[in-house]
Regions:
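Phosphate/pyrophosphate-binding loops at sites that engage ATP/ADP/AMP, CoA/4′-phosphopantetheine
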Residues: 1-10, 162-163
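Short coil/turn connectors at secondary-structure junctions
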Residues: 7-10, 38-41, 61-67, 74-76, ...
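Short beta-strand segments
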Residues: 13-15, 46, 67-72, 79-80
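Short Gly/Thr/Asp-enriched flexible loops that form oxyanion-binding sites at enzyme active sites
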Residues: 14-38
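Short, acidic/small-residue loops that bind anionic groups at enzyme active sites
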Residues: 31-51, 91-95
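Conserved phosphate-binding catalytic cores of ATP/NTP-utilizing and phosphoryl-transfer enzymes
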Residues: 45-67
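A short helix-loop
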Residues: 70-71, 78-166
């Protein structure tokens, strides 16, 4: 599909972390096999660093240093990007990622997957201040976050609203 030959491949890059262990192991095993079969180097890539680095392609004017907020269904991190390959995670979710919170909330509200954009559209229609929800801040952790309480609160609110016919 890519229109290239095996001889065009100079190396194989693969995510080694973070991620669901089963998916990471399958990806690593496949990538190692391909690299070995082709006789090319295997390049391990940190999943979140890859997301951040992809922005250099999309925004060529982007130059370190800067702070990056990396949010997905499985990870939420605040990253200090000092140089193109020098990055430090300053804070991360302690449990559920922000994206997982959005996806689960969207599902219980009958919204499509992934839930980020539909939840954003729904929130923009709200007058605000209707519900008191927990914050993602973790006591004693300057930049770490926790989204499990928020996710549970939204799910409980949605179930309660369904029970009372709201």
């Amino acid at each position: 599909q890519a229109g290239c030959e095996k001889s065009d491949i100079d190396a194989v890059a693969v995510t080694y972390a973070p991620g669901l262990i089963g998916a990471v192991l399958v990806g690593l095993s496949f990538a190692k096999s391909v690299a070995f079969a082709l006789g090319v180097p295997l390049i391990p890539v940190h999943h979140i660093r890859g997301h951040i680095a992809a922005n250099y392609l999309a925004f060529p004017e982007l130059e370190p240093p800067f702070l990056a907020l990396a949010i997905s269904g499985g990870n939420t991190m605040i990253v200090d990007v000092r140089d193109y390959t020098d990055m430090e995670i300053l804070g991360a979710t302690r449990d559920d990622a922000a994206g997982e919170c959005f996806d689960k909330a969207a599902r219980v509200l009958g919204l499509p997957y992934p839930g980020g954009a539909p939840m954003d559209a729904l929130a923009r229609q709200s007058p605000g201040g209707v519900y008191t929800l927990p914050h993602a801040h973790v006591d004693g952790a300057e930049l770490d976050m926790s989204f499990s309480g928020l996710k549970t609160a939204v799910v409980n609110l949605a179930h309660h609203a369904q029970q009372v016919g709201e």
